[in-house]
Amino acid sequence: MQLENKVAIVTGAARGLGRAYAEALAAEGAAVIAADLNDCNDTVAAITTAGGRAVATQVDVADSQSCDAMASLALDAFGRVDILINNAALYAGLKGARFEQLDETQWDKVMQVNIKGTWLTSRAVVGAMRSGGDGGSIINIASLAAVFGLPYGLDYVASKAAVIGMTRGMARELGPDHIRVNAVAPSAVMTEGTEEFFGEKFEKAKTVIAANQLIPRNLETEDLTGTIIYLASDASRFVTGQTHMVDGGSWFL
């Protein structure tokens, strides 16, 4: 197991990719804090049934006290924090529009969760990573949209571009502490959240997305978990400040 004796926090772990990340980390031996605004009991049940260790907690990543409580729970439950997966983000349910017609309230909410949330959760755990003496790994979930440009979703695009910039800045600051900071930028994964985003155009979107990649199929959850495990483990111990594109080569077309 690549992550034995490690402790990982995964935000947005109630469903979809966050749940998949949590289960994959646990399968490699990590103890997992499954954190979400929604209930994570199903995620924890899946992990513990498979023989892993996990606890659930409710967190609002845009609230500093909530993030601090999440970090404290991790320390109380498992004694350390080695890995943070900043996965919580607003995507499903966003109302797309031309940039000049985007709803201002929605814009502000996206920035609060996707940008401020990444900052607050990272800030909450970095002290524990430093005091642990072994460094750590922070993995920020960005998006292909940040570098490719997604029409009718400038709020989401801007937030994920900020995550890439934050990844680079944090990597520079935390390198002396042996805390690595990397980002993963996937293309669209066919989760329930993606289906909610595209709505009635979901089936057409699946076909169009697959056709515009060097590898002509849709991205699957398992395509991402391998990258997450790599970045969380000592296999990437000299890798930091990088954005890993997991997009089937669509960026090259």
Regions found by a protein language model. Give the residues of each.
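Residue(s) in the substrate-gating loop at a strand-loop-helix junction
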Residues: 143
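Alpha-helical segment proximal to the catalytic Tyr-Lys
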Residues: 127, 172-176, 237
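Conserved glycine-rich Rossmann-like NAD(P)H-binding loop of the short-chain dehydrogenase/reductase
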Residues: 28-42
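A glycine/serine/threonine-rich, flexible loop-to-helix segment
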Residues: 176, 188-212
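Short C-terminal tail/terminal secondary-structure segment
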Residues: 91, 95-96, 148, 229, ...
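Active-site helix of classical SDR
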Residues: 122, 159, 167
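Substrate-binding pocket helix/loop in short-chain dehydrogenase/reductase
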Residues: 67, 95-99, 103-108, 205, ...
